Amino acid sequence: MQGRAIWAEGPIHSFDLPSSSLERGGQALKSGASKTHAYMDEEVGTSTAEAWTWIVPSLSFIQGFMAGQAVLLMLFLGLFRYFFMTSSPGTRAQQQADLLQRVHAVRTSMDMRSHVPPYARVPYEQGVQACVQDLLSQVRYDPSEHAPESLDWLNVLVAQLLMSYRMSILNAGMCAGRNEDMDEPALPSTANAEKTAAKLALERVLNEAMQGRATKHFLDRLVVTDIDMGCRYPTFSHARVRPALHAKSTLVEIDFEYMDALTLGIDTRMWLHFPQWRFGSLAANLCMRVERFAGTLVLEIGTLPEPTPVQARVCLHPNFVLDAHLSTILGSKSKLQDVPKIEELFLARLRSWLEHNVVWPHFWHIPLPGIGTSPADPLA
């Protein structure tokens, strides 16, 4: 039979195959390989189609969900627009009627929820005097029968305020002392850390204030030689309410007394610029001590007869007491000490300043925060 090999013990004999048989065998191999590739391509295509069948439904679900949410939102907006909003404001009468209806509904709801008894007061249109009388009646204060009150609580608050100011001056002086060289002789103002700090703070304030004045060319640098901020506190008592003179408000009168040893000593030089610049200088050392300051303080809150912002006005009765002393030394070579006329002129000038600024009928005006005033208003 052709195409078979016969194995024997002897030598191997081969038979030659015809060429047509070889060609048919090669074509069979090629057709098998092509079928194998086609089968593999069919398997790959099937897996890809299955993957897309999983992706496409997920995208369709998200799109449908978003479309549903958009429809619900548009439906909600349409219902809200139809029930709660209007396209045109309507006539003025209709607007006022709607406003009254809303206000009445809110007021009725508030009255039903709250249990506060109704209060009544005198309308402001009846005048300030009627309002003041109504004010006194509501706070149950009769000026003609009410006894003067003690102000122990106010004494505590003022004492705490004064203590805070003293401590702030001490802290400011300590901060300034870190940057300044204390190469000065031992002065009463440097006896302890508290006085040293107060000296530095006060010197800085006084010398900065002198820079913008015309006297800076005639006065040398100011040196604080002695300072004592005191250790006691003022006391207030016998507060009573009185009607104001212009009958537009009430005022409060408070007696006060402050007994301490407030001391301030300053050393400087006064320059003479004639006939030439800095022709000569006159050394001057002044020390003032306030031992007692007492009187009656008047506090009034309200508006003046003319239209002005709301403010507090403070003044002193003319019978105030100011016990102070001044010691002076003038000159470098020959010295003039404690000239009585200088002390008299200085204390008279101090009392005159008080009388023209804080003694009745002059007031110290303290602007209070206003309503409806612009921020640029200096009194606001």
Swiss-Prot record:
<comment type="function">
    <text>Component of the ERMES/MDM complex, which serves as a molecular tether to connect the endoplasmic reticulum (ER) and mitochondria. Components of this complex are involved in the control of mitochondrial shape and protein biogenesis, and function in nonvesicular lipid trafficking between the ER and mitochondria. The MDM12-MMM1 subcomplex functions in the major beta-barrel assembly pathway that is responsible for biogenesis of all outer membrane beta-barrel proteins, and acts in a late step after the SAM complex.</text>
</comment>
<comment type="similarity">
    <text>Belongs to the MMM1 family.</text>
</comment>
<keyword id="KW-0812">Transmembrane</keyword>
<keyword id="KW-0256">Endoplasmic reticulum</keyword>
<dbReference type="GO" id="GO:1990456">
    <property type="term" value="P:mitochondrion-endoplasmic reticulum membrane tethering"/>
</dbReference>
<dbReference type="GO" id="GO:0032865">
    <property type="term" value="C:ERMES complex"/>
</dbReference>
<dbReference type="Pfam" id="PF10296">
    <property type="entry name" value="MMM1"/>
</dbReference>
<feature type="domain" description="SMP-LTD">
    <location>
        <begin position="147"/>
        <end position="369"/>
    </location>
</feature>
<comment type="subunit">
    <text>Homodimer. Component of the ER-mitochondria encounter structure (ERMES) or MDM complex, composed of MMM1, MDM10, MDM12 and MDM34. A MMM1 homodimer associates with one molecule of MDM12 on each side in a pairwise head-to-tail manner, and the SMP-LTD domains of MMM1 and MDM12 generate a continuous hydrophobic tunnel for phospholipid trafficking.</text>
</comment>
<keyword id="KW-1133">Transmembrane helix</keyword>
<protein>
    <recommendedName>
        <fullName>Maintenance of mitochondrial morphology protein 1</fullName>
    </recommendedName>
</protein>
<feature type="topological domain" description="Cytoplasmic">
    <location>
        <begin position="86"/>
        <end position="380"/>
    </location>
</feature>
<feature type="topological domain" description="Lumenal">
    <location>
        <begin position="1"/>
        <end position="64"/>
    </location>
</feature>
<dbReference type="InterPro" id="IPR019411">
    <property type="entry name" value="MMM1_dom"/>
</dbReference>
<dbReference type="GO" id="GO:0005789">
    <property type="term" value="C:endoplasmic reticulum membrane"/>
</dbReference>
<dbReference type="GO" id="GO:0000002">
    <property type="term" value="P:mitochondrial genome maintenance"/>
</dbReference>
<keyword id="KW-0472">Membrane</keyword>
<dbReference type="InterPro" id="IPR031468">
    <property type="entry name" value="SMP_LBD"/>
</dbReference>
<dbReference type="GO" id="GO:0008289">
    <property type="term" value="F:lipid binding"/>
</dbReference>
<keyword id="KW-0813">Transport</keyword>
<dbReference type="GO" id="GO:0045040">
    <property type="term" value="P:protein insertion into mitochondrial outer membrane"/>
</dbReference>
<keyword id="KW-0445">Lipid transport</keyword>
<feature type="transmembrane region" description="Helical">
    <location>
        <begin position="65"/>
        <end position="85"/>
    </location>
</feature>
<keyword id="KW-0446">Lipid-binding</keyword>
<dbReference type="InterPro" id="IPR027537">
    <property type="entry name" value="Mmm1"/>
</dbReference>
<dbReference type="GO" id="GO:0015914">
    <property type="term" value="P:phospholipid transport"/>
</dbReference>
